[in-house]
């Protein structure tokens, strides 16, 4: 908290940890506009602009309370948001600035926690790909997996109460209540919105929504893991230490009493030393080496946990239990499964010979081709059946710029899906992008694709095919055999922290 106090630089509020005064600082809205919130900006560049603009912000808050136009038509979203008349810009500006402010204590506590644990390369833990080596190492020994959809929407007051344990500023919490209750369409952030309208909150205030949703999930997981550890043979080692919160242990004690009264089940029924929990976005996975009966117990345990503690109605049908050997996990753009590779061994002993059937488990990861084609079709690189088409909006750019754009997209897709066991589907994606690039260039020069490719030669083909090899040659500059073997095998990059729009096909 010392770093947080130093960042505020407000002597008047130093002893109370108030966040509300930051709303009147202009640099907060610069951070919100540029979407560059990170530790270096928070801690190193806090002297960017200390000019107070309380009059402007007060006018925005007053004006925002006098209007209630949350839903707009799809055509209105194409207007200039800054030069045109937009009644929702005031609420958007305040909410984005507020999202930056409430993220400050969370970011600083996370940094101090990582430094206290002496985790040097903490940025690698943020990578999406870091979860797949964990799956490779552990899922081969498990039998059953449960796909879980985290229930929502949650009551608005529960969200405010969740933040109350972290943010000790009543004024900021009152402002948050104002956002949530003033606009009744806040639930459209979580539930689908009608096709004829676009929700201002869901489309333009995603930062505040993501923060509130993540705080809710963090609260749910911290309580769940805490109770899990109380009834397990082995304590969880991968979950970080919980931050100190007001009344946390008192609430946990009350929750344990509620469950002990409502569910008089012996603790050993839930004990499983080989249980793994993984979560990304609104999905989570619970894998176990035990029997389906054990996962069924956890299934109904979670349903009652959500209903009793968060007052969220959840159906048991949202949790599916499957056998790993017969089920594929649709997770982060990959289809992951555990396959049995049969092998026959002939054993010769004197005059007798025996044939031994042996099955070896293998963690298989493939890239689903149809969702990728749908993503390319949505981006206007091909039609719905995968036939490449030109990109007319790019035809006005230079030839080198057009080629560079297509190559960059191809490189990003190959980079993200580098962990696939078989890369045959990626070759088709490269073919679609290459031919779409050729059609775009031919459209620009008013020529046919055949004539343009004949004039260009094999240069365009080399641009698309050598990107992966060039990236690997930087890592293994002297090992050509190793380079080719890695090019055909699985590679996980720990610098990927978000999913590209073309990859996020869920």
From Swiss-Prot:
User: Which InterPro entries does this entry report, sorted A to Z?
Assistant: Domain_X, Maturase_MatK, Maturase_MatK_N
What biological processes does GO assign it? Answer: mRNA processing; RNA splicing; tRNA processing
Transmembrane stretches, start-end: none
Record bears the keyword tRNA processing: yes
Mostly located where? plastid
Family classification: Belongs to the intron maturase 2 family. MatK subfamily.
Q: What is the organism lineage in this UniProt record?
A: Eukaryota, Viridiplantae, Streptophyta, Embryophyta, Tracheophyta
Q: Which UniProt keywords apply?
A: Chloroplast, mRNA processing, Plastid, RNA-binding, tRNA processing
One Pfam family, please name it: MatK_N
Q: What does this protein do?
A: Usually encoded in the trnK tRNA gene intron. Probably assists in splicing its own and other chloroplast group II introns.
Name of the protein in its database record: Maturase K
Q: Where in the cell is it found?
A: Plastid, Chloroplast
| Gene Ontology CC: one annotated term | chloroplast
Q: Which GO MF terms does the UniProt record name?
A: RNA binding
